[in-house]
Amino acid sequence: MRVRRLVMLRHGQTEYNAGSRMQGQLDTDLSDLGREQAVAAAEVLAKRQPLLIVSSDLRRALDTAVALGDRSGQPVSIDTRLRETHLGDWQGMTHLEVDAAAPGARLAWRDDARWAPHGGESRVDVADRSLPLVHELVTQQTDWGAAGSDRPVVLVAHGGLIAALTAALLGLPVDNWPVLGGMGNASWVQLAGHTRADGDPGAFADIRWRLDVWNASAQVANDVL
């Protein structure tokens, strides 16, 4: 039975993270700590000999991915479908500013994967745009999981996207998506895609995904979730 390992790595810390400011798809840079976190995560994950590294185009994710690429000898490809959730009117606002402008709205957003800020995306929207990428990787990366290989495909992205994509791959009921909590900066998730015994090894529909690891890190420092 073929097993595909999928690692999803969140970017390192940004100043927006440190200041509890909502980024969404704003293109922010890693902080000094974030760059240290990216290197520490890269040193751990490079030992896994990634088969492929695909990154969001936003700088905080791409710079995190490049750190892994440099240490693993793998080029980094970019896919805009890995961008963070668009947060609409909330982008650039602090948590306190959002709470003052719309009391209770952040709680509703946390508790309902179908809910979106004005002008933004829900977690269901984010999963709908990112899930086809994994489908394509299963179809196109014929070496992924072949002959018992544990070499993972690594997606470097953002906490909101990783949670939404994980929930979708696991087939969780949408009402249960909020059980997947926040991730630390430069932390990662691992899923294993098991092809059914009677399934087609190249067919996405014949894969059952299992969660191996959630929110693992190299533990450079505590950070904002």
From Swiss-Prot:
Residues involved in substrate binding: R10, R60, H158
Superkingdom of this protein's organism: Bacteria
Enzyme class (EC, first level): hydrolase
Membrane-spanning ranges: none
Stored InterPro entries: His_Pase_superF_clade-1, His_PPase_superfam, PG/BPGM_mutase_AS, PGM_Phosphatase
CDD domains associated with the record: HP_PGM_like
Keywords: Hydrolase
Reactions this protein catalyses: (2R)-2-O-(alpha-D-glucopyranosyl)-3-phospho-glycerate + H2O = (2R)-2-O-(alpha-D-glucopyranosyl)-glycerate + phosphate
Annotated GO MF terms: phosphatase activity
Catalytic residues of the enzyme: H11, E84
GO cellular component, one term: cytoplasm
EC number: 3.1.3.85
Coiled coil residues, start to end: none
Keyword Cell wall biogenesis/degradation recorded: no
Function description: Involved in the biosynthesis of mycobacterial methylglucose lipopolysaccharides (MGLP). Catalyzes the dephosphorylation of glucosyl-3-phosphoglycerate (GPG) to glucosylglycerate.
Oligomeric form and interacting partners: Homodimer.
Family: Belongs to the phosphoglycerate mutase family.
Protein name: Glucosyl-3-phosphoglycerate phosphatase
Organism: Mycolicibacterium vanbaalenii (strain DSM 7251 / JCM 13017 / BCRC 16820 / KCTC 9966 / NRRL B-24157 / PYR-1)
